[in-house]
Amino acid sequence: MSLAWKNELLKLLKENVDSSGVIHPEYFQLATLPTGNEIYPRNRTVAIRGFVGTGWHKPRPDDVLATDLLVFSTDIASHKAAEIAEQQKNTFPSGPIPNAFEMCGWLPKTMQQIRISGQIWLYTPELADRNEFPADKLIQDHLINSNGRIPEEWSWEEERRRIWELHSPELRASFSTPPSYSKYQGDVKVSPLPSTLTGKEDPGVIEAWKTAWGRFSLVVCEANEVEFLNLTPPPGKRVLHNRDLNTKQWSSTRVNV
């Protein structure tokens, strides 16, 4: 497996970190295909949490697992989750890929654009139990330095827990609020939620925590094409990274801007 595009992405995001907190290079615009009776593609901004197993750091010897799968969280009560789940259900077992995605990010400090395309997957324990999420195959196809074996101490539930703990108490609480686009019936009081329960919390916090954890899911982005466009200095530089869907091997090509 080639790590060229992953290493380049990690380098660029590090170069674009803003100590003031104004610039968040991990925010990307994500576009997916329409479902059902919808006409238009859907687009939204998401906060990528790094790569499955390692987050935003380069693979280290003590990592349980390392991949080139990008991951972020979403609420299973959201339209986004329902759309992705419907598309991936129609993807199995083979054929067209209705769960296609493209994401795009702009890095203002270095004047660079990143585009990533491929297949998008929603993970919940229920989807995995119904074989509507390719749990093992997805990892086996994207493992880095693990000889094709999934470590026994790693699981998708452990990954969900890891991402959950990365969220702030306030952001965790947002998963217990009324679903997006539901009828507005006044502001809802939100209390920050801990990463785990001790049993000493107020009943209201415990109930909110259970709701939030139950609605907390992962979105996994399986990249097949990655494009880096550097606009400075002119005339710029555009590099394409493509993954062969049969051999799973990556190739890189520089093309004109």
UniProtKB/Swiss-Prot annotation:
Gene3D superfamilies: Electron Transport, Fmn-binding Protein, Chain A. One of its GO terms (cellular component) is cytosol. It comes from the Eukaryota. SUPFAM superfamilies: FMN-binding split barrel. GO terms for biological process: pyridoxal phosphate biosynthetic process from pyridoxamine. GO terms for molecular function: FMN binding; pyridoxamine phosphate oxidase activity. To yeast YGR017w. This is Uncharacterized protein C725.03. It comes from Schizosaccharomyces pombe (strain 972 / ATCC 24843).
